[in-house]
């Protein structure tokens, strides 16, 4: 976990140094208070003492207390600043790291776990930092100076303090040994609870459609009960520990006064006053030693939970993406817009067998390649290899004449416009969604935004909205229909002006008329752009230059619509299930 603190900025490190200086000053002033108290006690009990003497010492005591208060406030402000900045920076590091991870890495953590690590875990680390900066620095200094002040006092008082300290450490060590294993379990159960909650919220329509409310409620209750029971166990351990500590502290105070009473009773005449004042001062310093131990123990009690959180955050930050970025920023001019698969094999991580086998084809600039096949044939997996969502298991993929592994991530993404199966919109407005992301192409003007919306067949419904392109988009685009979201997503891909456009079954929510108009616009307006279309509907792809037929991860046919109708049994079966006899002729 302590590796995370290397990410503290220079400003934060300076603030921590100032905290150290202020805490030393604060402790020094606090330790003067018992000495002033002893002096006042002696003055009060000494015949002939002047009131001015008592007031003088009392004034110094008041100034010391006020100085300690001011320094403690300054320390609190600095610590709050450091912990807040550190938490914000850590979230940013974690967010940037997650964005750089491959799909394989992200699925290994799970989205619910990544959300928990970005929020709850970092909050735990912040809380530890707040406590640690104040208590870890303050406690050893306080304990050391207090022990130095009482080391020359009565040995029996010192022995009582040592016994109390050992008893306190023993109780806390036992409590921590019981509770620490549960801290990691609690974080895992937090992930589980977040996962179930997220499933319920994102799948609420399916849950209602299948009358599965009771099932999901039970699923949530099971996760919630496990989480609650673990929390109760940990809290019971802590609840037992705290009163035990205070019993020890009170017992130490009683022991000091009981020993003091015996010593005063047995001392020679004239030493009672000195012993009495020593007893008052010793009890105060002893409590400061014990409180210092207590503060350290509180930090150590929080540390295991913070360490679990820190390890979880570090696990993400230390994960090296299995997608190694290349160095090339441009393709070969003579192969611009080309895509070529050369004997590509692919299997998902931890899978037993390849789901794509010996895939070989080439698409030239401006051509349209359609990919069709039965469910589970590997269509989406194939096109996800082009932008390197996953890397091939064998063979190679060339984009613009270079292996995709040779490109920088930015350069490869700039060459490709990708429209996923699920239309993803981001909160903001329509214009922000269309011009979303960075590109090496020039910024879009208003008329260009209008134009790409027209190509995507989105301008018609956008113009009917009261605010047009400035119309608000809710989270995940929930205020738009599936077809509208798909058209905005398509406009976003076109707006990047890529060399290659990839559509992963991205016309599925469009009616036949809009589908046909969109395909026509793509052919006429983007004639020089290479297009790859994954589709389930034969009607969406029959005009493609090439149609690639997949079955069980293998190419079983490639050609035009007419050629495949005559020669390919798989394509014939798909076409016959969708087209009329007249359309098949």
Predicted regions located by residue number:
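Transmembrane helix-loop-helix hairpins at lipid-water interfaces of multipass membrane proteins
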Residues: 10, 16-74, 78, 151-156, ...
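An intracellular "coupling" helix at the cytosolic face of ABC transporter transmembrane type-1 domains
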Residues: 10-13, 103-104, 120-129, 133, ...
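Alpha-helical segments in transporter systems
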Residues: 14-35, 57, 61, 76-80, ...
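Juxtamembrane helix-loop junctions of ABC transporter transmembrane domains
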Residues: 21-22, 29-42, 64-111, 115, ...
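Helix-loop-helix
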Residues: 48-50, 149-163, 233-311, 316-317
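Conserved catalytic Walker-motif region of ABC-type ATPase nucleotide-binding domains
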Residues: 98, 220, 341-343
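ABC-type nucleotide-binding domain
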Residues: 332-585
């Amino acid at each position: 976990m302590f590796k995370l603190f290397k990410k503290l900025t220079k400003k934060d490190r300076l603030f921590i140094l100032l905290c150290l200086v202020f805490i030393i000053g604060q402790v020094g002033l606090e330790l003067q208070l018992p000495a002033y108290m002893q002096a006042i006690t002696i003055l009060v009990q000494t015949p002939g003492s002047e009131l001015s003497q008592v007031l003088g010492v009392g004034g110094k005591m008041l100034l010391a207390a006020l100085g300690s208060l001011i320094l403690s406030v300054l320390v609190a402000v600095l610590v709050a600043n450091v912990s807040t900045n550190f938490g914000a920076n850590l979230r940013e590091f974690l967010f940037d790291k997650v964005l750089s991870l491959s799909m394989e890495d992200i699925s290994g953590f799970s989205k619910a776990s990544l959300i928990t690590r970005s929020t709850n875990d970092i909050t735990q680390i912040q809380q530890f930092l707040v406590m640690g900066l104040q208590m870890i620095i303050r406690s050893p200094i306080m304990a050391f100076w207090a022990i130095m002040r009482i080391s020359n006092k009565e040995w029996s008082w010192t022995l009582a303090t040592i016994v109390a300290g050992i008893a306190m450490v023993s109780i806390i060590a036992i409590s921590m040994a019981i509770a620490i294993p549960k801290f990691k379990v609690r974080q895992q159960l937090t992930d589980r609870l977040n996962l179930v909650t997220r499933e319920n919220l994102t799948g609420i329509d399916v849950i209602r459609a299948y009358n599965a409310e009771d099932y999901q409620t039970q699923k949530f209750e099971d996760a919630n009960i496990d989480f609650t029971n673990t929390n109760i166990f940990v809290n019971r351990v802590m609840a037992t520990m705290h009163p035990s500590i205070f019993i020890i502290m009170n017992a130490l105070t009683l022991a000091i006064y009981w020993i003091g009473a015996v010593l005063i009773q047995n001392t020679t005449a004239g030493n009672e006053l000195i012993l009495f004042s020593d007893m008052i001062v010793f009890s105060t310093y002893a409590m400061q030693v014990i409180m210092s131990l207590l503060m350290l123990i509180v930090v150590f009690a929080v540390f295991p939970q913070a360490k679990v959180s820190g390890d979880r955050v570090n696990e993400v930050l230390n994960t090296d993406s299995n997608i190694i970025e290349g160095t090339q920023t441009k393709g070969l001019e003579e192969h611009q817009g080309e895509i070529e698969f050369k004997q590509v094999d692919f299997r998902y991580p931890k899978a037993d067998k390849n789901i794509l086998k010996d895939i070989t084809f080439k698409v030239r600039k401006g051509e349209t390649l359609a990919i069709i096949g039965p469910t589970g044939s590997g269509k989406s997996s194939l096109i996800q290899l082009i932008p390197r969502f996953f890397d091939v298991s064998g063979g190679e993929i060339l984009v613009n004449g270079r292996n995709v592994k040779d490109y920088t991530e930015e350069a490869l993404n700039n060459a490709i416009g990708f429209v996923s199966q699920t239309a993803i919109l981001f909160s903001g407005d329509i214009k922000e969604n269309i011009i979303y992301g960075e590109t090496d192409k020039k910024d879009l003007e208003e008329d260009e935004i209008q134009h790409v919306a027209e190509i995507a067949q989105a301008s018609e419904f956008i113009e009917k909205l009261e605010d047009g392109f400035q119309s608000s988009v809710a989270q995940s685009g929930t205020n738009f229909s599936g077809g509208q979201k798909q058209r905005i997503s398509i406009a976003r891909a076109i707006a990047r002006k890529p060399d290659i456009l990839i559509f992963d079954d991205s016309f599925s929510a469009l009616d036949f008329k809009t589908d046909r108009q969109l395909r026509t616009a793509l052919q006429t307006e983007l004639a020089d752009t290479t297009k790859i279309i994954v589709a389930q509907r034969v009607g969406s792809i029959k005009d493609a230059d090439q149609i690639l037929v997949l079955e069980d991860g293998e190419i079983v046919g490639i050609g035009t619509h007419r050629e495949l109708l005559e020669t390919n049994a798989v394509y014939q079966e798909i076409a016959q299930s969708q087209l009329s006899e007249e359309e098949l002729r």
